[in-house]
Amino acid sequence: MQRVPSRRAFLGAACVACGGAHLGFHATPVQAQQPPAPPAAAGAAAAARRRDWFPSRWGPQDEIGAANLLTPQKVLEAIRLAREGKTYRLGIVVDRNTPAFPPRSVAVTVMMPDQFGGAVVGESENRMSYCDDMVTGWFGVGTQIDGLAHLGIDGVFYNGNKAQDFVRTTGVTRLGIEKIPPFVTRAVLVDLARFRNRPRLDGGELVTADELRAAMQQQNVRVTPGDVVVLHTGWLSLIEQDPRRFGSEEPGIDAAGAEYLASLQPLAVGADTWGVEAVPFKNPKVIWQGHQVLLAQNGIYILENLDTRELVRDGVTEFLFVLGQPLYRGAVQGIINPVAIR
Protein backbone atom coordinates (compact mmCIF):
# COMPACT_ATOMS: atom_id res chain seq x y z
CA MET A 1 0.00 0.00 0.00
CA GLN A 2 1.25 3.50 -0.79
CA ARG A 3 2.51 5.23 2.31
CA VAL A 4 0.47 8.22 3.43
CA PRO A 5 2.57 11.37 3.96
CA SER A 6 3.40 12.50 7.47
CA ARG A 7 0.55 12.62 9.93
CA ARG A 8 0.87 16.41 10.11
CA ALA A 9 0.58 16.74 6.34
CA PHE A 10 -2.29 14.25 6.25
CA LEU A 11 -4.08 16.14 9.00
CA GLY A 12 -3.75 19.36 7.03
CA ALA A 13 -5.09 17.79 3.85
CA ALA A 14 -7.99 16.19 5.67
CA CYS A 15 -8.89 19.38 7.48
CA VAL A 16 -8.98 21.40 4.28
CA ALA A 17 -11.34 18.86 2.71
CA CYS A 18 -13.43 18.38 5.81
CA GLY A 19 -13.99 22.06 6.43
CA GLY A 20 -12.50 21.86 9.93
CA ALA A 21 -14.01 18.50 10.86
CA HIS A 22 -11.00 17.76 13.05
CA LEU A 23 -12.34 20.33 15.48
CA GLY A 24 -15.25 17.99 16.20
CA PHE A 25 -15.23 15.02 18.50
CA HIS A 26 -11.51 14.26 18.72
CA ALA A 27 -10.10 17.62 19.75
CA THR A 28 -9.96 16.91 23.50
CA PRO A 29 -8.45 13.93 25.36
CA VAL A 30 -11.63 13.28 27.32
CA GLN A 31 -13.52 12.71 25.21
CA ALA A 32 -37.13 -8.35 23.87
CA GLN A 33 -39.86 -6.29 22.90
CA GLN A 34 -39.60 -3.60 20.29
CA PRO A 35 -41.08 -0.34 21.57
CA PRO A 36 -42.14 2.31 19.09
CA ALA A 37 -39.34 4.42 17.64
CA PRO A 38 -38.84 7.87 19.16
CA PRO A 39 -39.80 10.88 17.05
CA ALA A 40 -37.05 12.17 14.76
CA ALA A 41 -35.21 15.17 16.10
CA ALA A 42 -35.48 18.48 14.27
CA GLY A 43 -31.70 18.81 14.31
CA ALA A 44 -28.78 18.30 16.61
CA ALA A 45 -28.58 21.95 17.65
CA ALA A 46 -32.24 22.08 18.61
CA ALA A 47 -32.01 18.70 20.30
CA ALA A 48 -29.02 19.87 22.31
CA ARG A 49 -31.14 22.72 23.65
CA ARG A 50 -34.32 20.71 24.25
CA ARG A 51 -32.72 17.53 25.59
CA ASP A 52 -35.82 15.68 24.41
CA TRP A 53 -33.90 12.68 23.09
CA PHE A 54 -33.36 11.03 26.45
CA PRO A 55 -34.05 9.02 28.53
CA SER A 56 -33.84 6.07 26.18
CA ARG A 57 -36.93 4.14 25.18
CA TRP A 58 -35.25 1.20 26.94
CA GLY A 59 -35.07 3.01 30.24
CA PRO A 60 -32.78 5.56 31.93
CA GLN A 61 -30.18 2.94 32.91
CA ASP A 62 -29.80 1.37 29.46
CA GLU A 63 -26.26 1.23 28.05
CA ILE A 64 -26.63 -0.82 24.85
CA GLY A 65 -29.21 1.06 22.81
CA ALA A 66 -30.40 -0.68 19.66
CA ALA A 67 -28.67 -3.90 20.74
CA ASN A 68 -31.83 -4.45 22.79
CA LEU A 69 -33.41 -5.45 19.47
CA LEU A 70 -31.22 -8.57 19.31
CA THR A 71 -33.82 -10.93 20.70
CA PRO A 72 -33.44 -14.73 20.52
CA GLN A 73 -36.15 -14.74 17.85
CA LYS A 74 -34.21 -12.19 15.80
CA VAL A 75 -31.04 -14.28 16.02
CA LEU A 76 -32.83 -17.48 14.98
CA GLU A 77 -34.46 -15.72 12.03
CA ALA A 78 -31.08 -14.38 10.92
CA ILE A 79 -29.37 -17.77 11.13
CA ARG A 80 -31.82 -19.13 8.54
CA LEU A 81 -30.25 -16.77 5.98
CA ALA A 82 -27.10 -18.92 5.90
CA ARG A 83 -28.10 -21.32 3.12
CA GLU A 84 -24.91 -21.74 1.06
CA GLY A 85 -22.24 -21.60 3.75
CA LYS A 86 -20.23 -18.93 1.93
CA THR A 87 -18.46 -16.42 4.17
CA TYR A 88 -17.26 -12.89 3.47
CA ARG A 89 -14.66 -10.99 5.44
CA LEU A 90 -15.95 -7.44 5.87
CA GLY A 91 -12.86 -6.10 7.65
CA ILE A 92 -9.81 -4.62 5.97
CA VAL A 93 -6.19 -5.36 6.78
CA VAL A 94 -4.72 -2.69 9.06
CA ASP A 95 -1.09 -1.56 9.22
CA ARG A 96 0.91 1.58 9.94
CA ASN A 97 0.06 2.98 6.48
CA THR A 98 -3.72 2.60 6.74
CA PRO A 99 -5.35 6.02 6.17
CA ALA A 100 -7.27 7.13 9.23
CA PHE A 101 -9.04 10.12 10.70
CA PRO A 102 -6.23 12.40 11.96
CA PRO A 103 -4.29 12.00 14.16
CA ARG A 104 -5.08 8.29 14.41
CA SER A 105 -2.60 5.59 13.45
CA VAL A 106 -1.70 2.06 14.47
CA ALA A 107 1.56 0.13 14.43
CA VAL A 108 2.52 -3.45 15.25
CA THR A 109 5.94 -4.19 16.79
CA VAL A 110 7.16 -7.81 16.83
CA MET A 111 9.96 -8.91 19.14
CA MET A 112 11.73 -12.08 20.31
CA PRO A 113 12.32 -11.39 24.03
CA ASP A 114 15.71 -12.49 25.42
CA GLN A 115 16.58 -14.32 22.21
CA PHE A 116 19.31 -12.09 20.83
CA GLY A 117 21.92 -13.62 18.59
CA GLY A 118 20.04 -16.87 18.14
CA ALA A 119 19.62 -17.61 21.85
CA VAL A 120 16.70 -19.77 22.92
CA VAL A 121 14.35 -19.31 25.86
CA GLY A 122 15.93 -20.21 29.19
CA GLU A 123 18.54 -22.44 27.53
CA SER A 124 15.75 -24.94 26.97
CA GLU A 125 16.90 -28.37 25.80
CA ASN A 126 14.17 -28.41 23.17
CA ARG A 127 15.42 -24.97 22.00
CA MET A 128 12.07 -23.23 22.30
CA SER A 129 11.77 -19.93 20.45
CA TYR A 130 8.84 -17.54 20.30
CA CYS A 131 7.72 -14.18 18.96
CA ASP A 132 5.65 -11.64 20.84
CA ASP A 133 3.97 -8.51 19.59
CA MET A 134 2.78 -5.13 20.77
CA VAL A 135 0.23 -2.79 19.23
CA THR A 136 0.59 0.97 19.58
CA GLY A 137 -2.23 3.07 18.25
CA TRP A 138 -5.86 4.05 18.19
CA PHE A 139 -8.95 1.86 18.07
CA GLY A 140 -10.52 4.04 15.36
CA VAL A 141 -8.44 2.73 12.47
CA GLY A 142 -9.53 0.44 9.65
CA THR A 143 -12.84 -1.38 9.93
CA GLN A 144 -14.32 -0.20 13.20
CA ILE A 145 -17.39 0.03 15.38
CA ASP A 146 -18.40 3.32 16.96
CA GLY A 147 -19.80 2.65 20.41
CA LEU A 148 -22.41 4.79 22.12
CA ALA A 149 -19.80 6.73 24.10
CA HIS A 150 -17.99 7.80 20.94
CA LEU A 151 -19.91 10.92 19.98
CA GLY A 152 -22.46 13.11 21.72
CA ILE A 153 -24.19 16.47 21.69
CA ASP A 154 -22.78 19.29 23.79
CA GLY A 155 -21.06 16.89 26.16
CA VAL A 156 -24.12 14.64 26.51
CA PHE A 157 -24.05 11.12 25.11
CA TYR A 158 -26.57 8.31 24.60
CA ASN A 159 -29.31 8.16 27.21
CA GLY A 160 -28.37 11.50 28.75
CA ASN A 161 -24.96 10.44 30.04
CA LYS A 162 -22.89 13.56 30.67
CA ALA A 163 -19.19 13.42 29.85
CA GLN A 164 -18.11 14.74 33.24
CA ASP A 165 -19.92 11.85 34.92
CA PHE A 166 -18.45 8.91 33.00
CA VAL A 167 -15.55 9.87 30.71
CA ARG A 168 -12.14 9.15 32.24
CA THR A 169 -8.71 8.97 30.64
CA THR A 170 -8.54 5.36 31.86
CA GLY A 171 -11.79 4.51 30.05
CA VAL A 172 -15.47 5.33 30.18
CA THR A 173 -17.38 3.98 33.15
CA ARG A 174 -20.62 3.71 31.16
CA LEU A 175 -21.44 2.84 27.53
CA GLY A 176 -18.13 1.01 27.04
CA ILE A 177 -17.53 -1.37 24.16
CA GLU A 178 -17.45 -4.28 26.61
CA LYS A 179 -21.17 -3.78 27.29
CA ILE A 180 -22.21 -4.55 23.70
CA PRO A 181 -23.56 -8.09 23.15
CA PRO A 182 -22.46 -10.16 20.14
CA PHE A 183 -24.10 -9.14 16.87
CA VAL A 184 -25.79 -12.10 15.20
CA THR A 185 -28.48 -10.65 13.02
CA ARG A 186 -29.85 -10.01 9.56
CA ALA A 187 -28.06 -7.47 7.39
CA VAL A 188 -29.04 -5.78 4.15
CA LEU A 189 -26.83 -4.08 1.59
CA VAL A 190 -27.90 -1.00 -0.35
CA ASP A 191 -25.77 -0.48 -3.46
CA LEU A 192 -25.71 3.30 -3.82
CA ALA A 193 -23.10 3.16 -6.59
CA ARG A 194 -25.40 0.99 -8.70
CA PHE A 195 -28.29 3.31 -7.89
CA ARG A 196 -26.26 6.18 -9.39
CA ASN A 197 -25.09 3.97 -12.30
CA ARG A 198 -21.43 4.52 -11.43
CA PRO A 199 -18.69 2.30 -10.02
CA ARG A 200 -17.92 4.80 -7.27
CA LEU A 201 -19.53 7.90 -5.80
CA ASP A 202 -17.45 11.06 -5.47
CA GLY A 203 -15.98 12.60 -2.35
CA GLY A 204 -18.50 14.90 -0.70
CA GLU A 205 -21.36 13.43 -2.74
CA LEU A 206 -24.51 13.44 -0.64
CA VAL A 207 -27.07 10.65 -0.75
CA THR A 208 -30.31 12.15 0.51
CA ALA A 209 -32.99 10.46 2.56
CA ASP A 210 -35.26 10.33 -0.49
CA GLU A 211 -32.49 8.70 -2.52
CA LEU A 212 -31.88 6.13 0.21
CA ARG A 213 -35.56 5.29 0.12
CA ALA A 214 -35.57 5.10 -3.69
CA ALA A 215 -32.44 2.93 -3.83
CA MET A 216 -33.90 0.49 -1.33
CA GLN A 217 -37.12 0.32 -3.30
CA GLN A 218 -35.25 -0.20 -6.58
CA GLN A 219 -33.18 -3.03 -5.09
CA ASN A 220 -36.03 -4.63 -3.12
CA VAL A 221 -34.26 -4.03 0.18
CA ARG A 222 -36.48 -4.08 3.26
CA VAL A 223 -35.15 -3.17 6.69
CA THR A 224 -36.65 -4.78 9.78
CA PRO A 225 -35.94 -3.77 13.41
CA GLY A 226 -32.56 -5.03 14.60
CA ASP A 227 -31.00 -5.32 11.13
CA VAL A 228 -27.60 -3.99 10.13
CA VAL A 229 -27.89 -1.60 7.18
CA VAL A 230 -24.78 -1.56 4.97
CA LEU A 231 -24.26 1.18 2.37
CA HIS A 232 -21.99 0.50 -0.62
CA THR A 233 -20.56 3.57 -2.34
CA GLY A 234 -17.48 2.09 -4.02
CA TRP A 235 -15.27 4.47 -2.05
CA LEU A 236 -13.13 1.74 -0.47
CA SER A 237 -11.60 1.05 -3.88
CA LEU A 238 -9.46 4.16 -3.34
CA ILE A 239 -7.78 2.99 -0.14
CA GLU A 240 -4.85 1.46 -2.05
CA GLN A 241 -5.06 3.61 -5.20
CA ASP A 242 -5.12 7.02 -3.52
CA PRO A 243 -4.98 6.79 0.30
CA ARG A 244 -4.68 10.57 0.76
CA ARG A 245 -7.86 11.20 -1.19
CA PHE A 246 -9.60 8.25 0.46
CA GLY A 247 -8.99 9.64 3.93
CA SER A 248 -9.67 13.31 3.27
CA GLU A 249 -13.16 13.13 1.77
CA GLU A 250 -15.97 10.65 1.23
CA PRO A 251 -19.51 10.25 -0.09
CA GLY A 252 -22.32 9.48 2.30
CA ILE A 253 -25.44 10.54 4.11
CA ASP A 254 -26.35 13.55 6.24
CA ALA A 255 -28.50 14.09 9.32
CA ALA A 256 -31.73 13.72 7.35
CA GLY A 257 -30.52 10.43 5.91
CA ALA A 258 -29.52 9.28 9.37
CA GLU A 259 -32.96 10.20 10.71
CA TYR A 260 -34.62 8.21 7.92
CA LEU A 261 -32.47 5.17 8.65
CA ALA A 262 -33.08 5.56 12.40
CA SER A 263 -36.82 5.48 11.74
CA LEU A 264 -36.35 1.91 10.45
CA GLN A 265 -34.92 0.86 13.86
CA PRO A 266 -31.70 -0.83 12.73
CA LEU A 267 -29.11 -2.23 15.09
CA ALA A 268 -26.31 -0.50 13.18
CA VAL A 269 -25.60 1.52 10.06
CA GLY A 270 -22.37 0.86 8.19
CA ALA A 271 -20.63 1.81 4.97
CA ASP A 272 -17.51 1.22 2.89
CA THR A 273 -16.29 4.68 3.92
CA TRP A 274 -14.34 5.89 6.94
CA GLY A 275 -17.14 8.04 8.37
CA VAL A 276 -20.48 7.10 6.71
CA GLU A 277 -21.35 10.79 6.22
CA ALA A 278 -20.64 12.98 3.18
CA VAL A 279 -17.38 14.92 3.69
CA PRO A 280 -16.66 17.82 3.16
CA PHE A 281 -19.75 18.89 5.03
CA LYS A 282 -22.20 21.20 3.29
CA ASN A 283 -21.97 23.54 6.27
CA PRO A 284 -18.47 23.40 7.84
CA LYS A 285 -19.95 24.59 11.14
CA VAL A 286 -22.34 21.61 11.33
CA ILE A 287 -20.22 18.48 11.53
CA TRP A 288 -20.91 14.78 12.11
CA GLN A 289 -24.59 15.43 12.71
CA GLY A 290 -25.49 12.02 11.33
CA HIS A 291 -23.36 10.46 14.05
CA GLN A 292 -25.25 12.50 16.63
CA VAL A 293 -28.58 11.28 15.27
CA LEU A 294 -27.56 7.62 15.20
CA LEU A 295 -25.34 7.24 18.26
CA ALA A 296 -26.50 9.84 20.77
CA GLN A 297 -30.17 10.24 19.95
CA ASN A 298 -31.06 6.69 18.93
CA GLY A 299 -28.40 4.34 20.31
CA ILE A 300 -27.69 2.94 16.84
CA TYR A 301 -24.13 1.74 16.25
CA ILE A 302 -21.98 2.89 13.34
CA LEU A 303 -19.69 0.56 11.35
CA GLU A 304 -17.01 2.14 9.19
CA ASN A 305 -14.67 0.92 6.43
CA LEU A 306 -16.70 -2.22 5.73
CA ASP A 307 -15.30 -4.13 2.76
CA THR A 308 -18.43 -4.66 0.71
CA ARG A 309 -16.75 -5.34 -2.62
CA GLU A 310 -17.14 -9.11 -2.74
CA LEU A 311 -20.75 -8.93 -1.58
CA VAL A 312 -21.50 -6.52 -4.42
CA ARG A 313 -19.71 -8.70 -6.97
CA ASP A 314 -21.86 -11.65 -5.89
CA GLY A 315 -25.06 -9.59 -5.93
CA VAL A 316 -25.74 -10.20 -2.22
CA THR A 317 -28.30 -7.88 -0.65
CA GLU A 318 -29.37 -9.93 2.39
CA PHE A 319 -27.14 -12.01 4.66
CA LEU A 320 -26.34 -13.20 8.16
CA PHE A 321 -24.10 -10.69 9.95
CA VAL A 322 -21.83 -11.87 12.77
CA LEU A 323 -19.59 -9.74 14.96
CA GLY A 324 -17.98 -10.36 18.32
CA GLN A 325 -16.80 -7.03 19.70
CA PRO A 326 -13.33 -6.56 21.20
CA LEU A 327 -13.78 -6.50 24.98
CA TYR A 328 -11.54 -3.62 25.98
CA ARG A 329 -13.13 -2.27 29.14
CA GLY A 330 -13.95 1.40 28.87
CA ALA A 331 -13.17 1.74 25.15
CA VAL A 332 -15.50 3.82 22.98
CA GLN A 333 -14.72 2.18 19.64
CA GLY A 334 -12.90 -0.86 18.34
CA ILE A 335 -11.15 -2.35 15.31
CA ILE A 336 -13.35 -5.19 14.05
CA ASN A 337 -13.64 -7.88 11.39
CA PRO A 338 -17.34 -8.65 10.85
CA VAL A 339 -18.33 -11.71 8.87
CA ALA A 340 -21.15 -11.99 6.36
CA ILE A 341 -22.60 -15.45 5.72
CA ARG A 342 -25.07 -16.55 3.07
Question: What residue ranges belong to the model's regions?
Answer:
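Signal peptide processing junction and immediate N-terminal pro/mature segment
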Residues: 23-35
